[in-house]
Amino acid sequence: EDVGKIGDVNQGFAGLQEKHGESRVTDTGIREMSIVGQGLGAAMRGLRPLVEIQYLDYLLFALQILSDDAATLQYRSAGGQKAPLIVRTRGHRLEGIWHSGSPMGMILHSLRGMLVLVPRNMVQAAGFYNTLMHCDEPALVVECLNGYRLKEKRPDNLHEFRVVPGHAEILREGSDLTLVTYGSCCRIAMEAADLLQSMGISIEVVDAQSLLPFDVNGLCAQSLRKTSRLLILDEDVPGGASSYLLQQILEVQNGFPLLDWAPVTLTAQAHRPAYGSDGDYFSKPSVDDVVETVWGLMSRAEPGYYPP
């Protein structure tokens, strides 16, 4: 929808229809299930389609076909059929109820069998796309809506640069607490870590960047061996993707015995993002929220050093 003539709503495909023709860069009707269904059919016929859902909130209209058909194809065909479908969308932070949702828990529960990737910026997104172009797995890539106009360090080999699914990345080393997050929250975490450093608290920030699969090398557990404290920062509602991240770190990576204090989650409010230009700020975690949460955790663990 709108990827051809106008080059998508954020101009990510600008000029591609003119360059490659309407047969390769095609506008569709406004029906997400049909868009994904067309892509899935093309993928099963040997092509490598990239389909776009304008906003993450609208992916819910296509969730049934992604869950029933794309995610289960290799499983139910005993590996006999593959569909290298790439679904591109954008979400997390914007304005209003229908353009800034982060229903990642629902997606993670429904799409076992697909890759679910959540790059923190466009360079990381390009690395994932370069990898997926040579991969036979169906994948969902959720880009950051508030990341399109940021200036980033760009590798000279951007067309060859690859990011491997399943590999987390330490963005900042620290010794007092491990903060695990992804997507747009990475910038919030980094800004909060700077403030907390000035207050005498050293935060290790881990970008999961791939939720399915999640941190196959156990980087989060390695970090906990150093810090012994854990905070999950997530834009989904309470008990959404944060619950999945806790299960992966504490159970799959056996991180629970490494903790000296109960793990903490900091999530969005238990409702859809509020209306208005400031609705996102009051509905989702902010830098202030992170600083207050970390200080509260540290004051409970070491009240002598960090008074309540």
Where is each model-derived feature located?
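Thiamine diphosphate
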Residues: 1-142, 145-308
